[in-house]
Amino acid sequence: MRLDFENAYADVISFDCGTEVKEYHAMIHVAESRLPYAKQLEAVINAYHALLSKWPDTQAVFKRYFLSDAANQADDVIVADVTDCAKSIIQQAPLDGTKIALWVYLMSNVQTSLTKSGLYQVSHGEFRHLYNASAHNLAANSEYQMRLLFNEYIMQLAEEGCTLSENCIRTWLFVNDIDLNYGGVVRARNQVFFTQGLTVHTHFIASTGIGGRQQDPNVLSQMDNYAIAGIRPEQIHYLYAPTHLNRTSDYGVSFERGTYIDYADRRHVFISGTASINNKGEIMFPKDVEKQTRRIWENVEALLKEADCTYDNVVEMVVYLRDVADYEVVRALYEERFPDKPFVIVNAPVCRPGWLVEMECMALKAVNNPDLPMF
């Protein structure tokens, strides 16, 4: 559903399977691109508060701000938004011509707090959902930065009685000048994962590795992540779609194409950043953004199908474009195919230059698994 506010609007999907926790995904956009940044930020923050007043029993559990110029804008977001949740702030310019967009994930009837480890905790029932965002450091290069990020995260998880291999469900890796610095990020992740027992013979973690920068140009790698304390191994399932995609380890990287988590009452599906690839690892339809977009849809559909889901179950999408000149074509395709979905299209180069476009998404489905704990 679309909700209109002063100088902003939100596309929202709510999920209610009849149990205690309702979930909401909202993509908040600025309606008037000619406004100065301060007014655009104000419009987004006011729209967020209007959503909270519409659903007074909800709390934000995760936010991502997409900015057009982090060096000039990020500090203002930090001052304006004092919400007690994980806040991801990244320069990935919204391609509708505005300076800021916000993806916010809300839940009802949960308790939120900041843990001693520095992770944001969302508690309900047996589980503690642990979110972290905008993690960064100033090590010498992208490889050292990413290795330190993962090692610090492993220590944070240990403080929560968790491990990377058993509890981490999703990561986002943002790489400043990805064409130059992605190789270092890949090496660091491969090395850390090997030490943590994450191999081609066990499993990896659903992830997006994408271009994005911070306000400090010396930050070459930023990480957001999500883990679940209390999750059981039998609740976690990995998605492969081998008819459409190959294993990422075939071309030297280490992430899962998708993951779904089952509870007694619902299924959470996390689709990693997905590009126009085939099951040999080749780029499909080089230099044709429309055909690449349609191939992505097909690939994501195949992954969703393995989780017994369709696009009807998708609750949010982020679309990454390498070339701003492709925006009108891609926007028209998405608006025609997904008129009622919360999505945002941002300027962010994909990890391989030949991939012009990439998308990630999350899906939610009501299920009945009486042998599993409730969400």
Q: Where are the model-predicted features located?
A:
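N-terminal presequence-like segments and the immediate start of the first folded domain
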Residues: 1-312, 321-375
